[in-house]
A protein has these predicted regions:
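Glycine-aromatic micro-motifs
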Residues: 2-159
Length: 159
């Protein structure tokens, strides 16, 4: 029987997976795997973070040099949790992921996986660029259970 790796994977989250946000429960459910909060951090690269679709989904767009250094949280996760995050983010169909350098609040730099959108309508670049995502009453995130099943978020980016 092949042995599973016990090495943890660092993941940077900037949207609904952060503490206090609508999908944070994904990181706290034991059945999804293991996740441990490491600390808060900021991307070294500037990228546009926008809110899009009728469901108010935060998107980190693959457009280097635009936008801001993005604030978020770093977690160490096991392979099972990483696979479940891939399911949540619909990787590689909707979101892609890559390793980027993140600066922790103590100025230590670490390499982390983060999810971002590579193919998107240019219209998203006209939205306000955020430094950090927070779910708000003005732009409330809509859970998958509240969405129209006939409208895929990936088809709704121009909304």
């Amino acid at each position: 029987m092949p042995k599973l790796s016990t090495e943890l994977i660092k993941v940077f989250v900037y949207g609904t997976l952060k503490r206090g946000e609508p999908n944070h429960h994904w990181l706290t459910r034991n059945e999804n795997g293991f996740a441990r909060f490491v600390g808060e951090g900021t991307t070294v690269e500037r990228l546009p973070l926008v809110i899009g679709t009728r469901y108010n989904i935060p998107f980190l767009l693959d457009k280097r040099g635009l936008g801001h250094n993005i604030k978020g949280e770093i977690y160490e996760v096991d392979e099972k949790m990483f696979a479940n995050l891939d399911i949540l983010e619909d990787y590689p169909v909707y979101y892609d992921r890559e390793i980027q350098t993140i600066t922790l609040n103590n100025n230590e730099q670490v390499q982390c996986w983060l999810y971002l959108i590579r193919k998107f309508p240019e219209k998203l670049l006209q939205k306000d660029y955020l430094t950090a995502y927070h779910n708000t009453k003005e732009q409330p995130y809509r859970e998958r259970s509240e969405r129209d099943l006939n409208i895929k978020a990936s088809d709704d980016m121009s909304y």
